[in-house]
Structure formats: C-alpha cells, structure tokens
Amino acid sequence: MEQLLGIKLGCLFALLALTLGCGLTPICFKWFQIDAARGHHRLVLRLLGCISAGVFLGAGFMHMTAEALEEIESQIQKFMVQNRSASERNSSGDADSAHMEYPYGELIISLGFFFVFFLESLALQCCPGAAGGSTVQDEEWGGAHIFELHSHGHLPSPSKGPLRALVLLLSLSFHSVFEGLAVGLQPTVAATVQLCLAVLAHKGLVVFGVGMRLVHLGTSSRWAVFSILLLALMSPLGLAVGLAVTGGDSEGGRGLAQAVLEGVAAGTFLYVTFLEILPRELASPEAPLAKWSCVAAGFAFMAFIALWA
C-alpha cells in the first residue's frame, strides 16, 4: 500500500513538472513567436503549429471523445440498472432496451459543442465593438488575396481567438482533472504506472500546443504563464482527489455527473479544434501538402498513444 502511494505521489509531481516544462517552453523562448519570424523560420513555426493542430485533433477524437463515450455509456447502464425494479424489468424491458441504444454520449458531446457556440455568439452579440481585433492579427488574417487563393472559405474573426483560447483552457482543465482522478483511483502499481505514462505521453504534446497557441494569439507573457500554471495544477489536483476518495462509494449519480462533464469538455474541445485551431493553421496558402503531412503526423502520434491510454 505504501509503495502504491509513493508511485502515485511520483506520478503527481511528474504530471506537474512535464506540464509546466512543455507549456512554458514556447512562452519563454522568443524563437516560437511567429509575429517576428520571417522566411524559413516562419514556415517552420507554421508547420509546428500544424503538428500541434493534429495533436489537438487526435486528442479530441482518440482520447477525450473516446473516453467520454465509453464512460457515459457505462455510467448510464449502471444508473438504469440501479433505478429499475424487478417489476419494471418484466413490464418494460423493450423500453429499457430502446433507452440503452440511444446515443446519449454523442448527444452530450454535441451539447458541449453547441453550448460554447452559444456563449461565443452571445458574447459577439453583446459586444459588437470587439470585432476589430488586434493590429498583429489583422495583418496576419487580413488581405483579400488569402481568401481568394485559399479554398477553406471565410475564416473566423480574429477577435474570437482569446475567447476560444479560454474555452480551450477550460475544456483541457476539466479533462486533466479527470485524467488525474483516473490515475489516483488505480488499484495496483502496474496499472498506475501504465496509465500515468500514457497520460504523460500525450499531455506533453498537447500542453506544448497550448503554449504555442497562446503565443501566436499575442497573449501577454504574464497571462500565458498564469494559464499554463493553472492547467498544470489540474491533473495533480485530480490525482490528489483520487487518492482521497480511493475505496469510496461511487453511487448517487457522482460517476454519471463526472461522465457528463467529461462529455461536455470533449464537445468544447472539438469546437475549438475545428473552428479555431485548424482554420488558423490552414489559412495561409504556402506548402499545403507539408501542412497536411504535419497535421496527419500529429494525429497519427495521438492515435498510436491511444493503444495504451
């Protein structure tokens, strides 16, 4: 028991150190600032951004969405079994079967997607004056020739970037808490180490991508560091909670509530991935095949890690 506790505490500090190191690297080194980059340097940063976009895409589909769907289905099955009497089993078995076949997980993830869509639309409706955007972003996104040459259609307004960055941080924070919670609840040393290594493998790349995203959005260094620090604390927080509640009772809908929150977080993450990250990285027309290769490489790496996650 003491060995298991020591391993989990080691995982806690490893998660904290890796997240801080990977997240702060793009913020602390000026080489990653795309605004001042020119020529080959700028293209390399663009391709790194495409790799991070592929990592986000893989994390959204292969980890967050997959885990949310599995957990929601499992918790709904438990919830329905616990709240069904013997008489109801005999009289409404067909109805229960129909309820079990309904895609609850997909619905919850979609609700998370539309919830953020609504919040963003509401913010833009209430603050129409914010549509101006920053000078740097206007230079990067402006220029009618980009819209004419590129086939991806109209790009999102640059003023939405900070809001979507906030949504990205919140969704990743939720997911990080649940990842840490899962590590903290593991019953054996082998299971704890295996899950922690899987989390470390994909979390490092994801947080590095978050750091790059904050830098490219022109976030001040102070707020960027503060954001990474908060994100870094989420997995250790979840792990600490897992240690505190090990052996506790998961009845009373607590597991279902956790699964629903994870589904909503997955939906918000997909929203930001498809409407902010991918369009921004694919906006400029240079090296389209190289960009595709980088996005595919990032996704493939996350799909490979999903074998052990």
Swiss-Prot record:
Changing residue 120 to A: Does not affect pH sensitivity. Its main location: membrane. Induction: Shows a dramatic induction in normal epithelial cells contact inhibition. Activity is increased at acidic pH (6.5). Inhibited in the presence of high extracellular K(+). It is found in: Cell membrane. Keywords: Cell membrane, Ion transport, Membrane, Transmembrane, Transmembrane helix, Transport, Zinc, Zinc transport. Transport activity is maximal at acidic pH (<6.0) and almost negligible at pH >7.5. GO terms for molecular function: metal ion transmembrane transporter activity; zinc ion transmembrane transporter activity. Expressed only in prostate and uterine epithelial cells. Changing residue 269 to L: Exhibits a broader substrate selectivity. The keyword Transmembrane applies. Changing residue 176 to A: Does not alter the substrate selectivity of SLC39A2. The record marks 63 as: Critical for the pH sensitivity. The chain crosses the membrane at residues 9-29, 47-67, 104-124, 165-185, 190-210, 225-245, 259-279, 289-309. Residues 1-8, 68-103, 186-189, 246-258 are extracellular. Changing residue 71 to A/Q: Does not affect pH sensitivity. Transporter for the divalent cation Zn(2+). Mediates the influx of Zn(2+) into cells from extracellular space. The Zn(2+) uniporter activity is independent of H(+)-driving force, but is modulated by extracellular pH and membrane potential. Also transports other divalent cations Zn(2+), Cd2(+), Cu2(+), Co2(+) in the order of decreasing affinity, respectively. In the skin, aids in the differentiation of keratinocytes in the epidermis. Belongs to the ZIP transporter (TC 2.A.5) family. This is Zinc transporter ZIP2. It comes from Homo sapiens (Human). The lineage of its organism: Eukaryota, Metazoa, Chordata, Craniata, Vertebrata. The gene is SLC39A2.
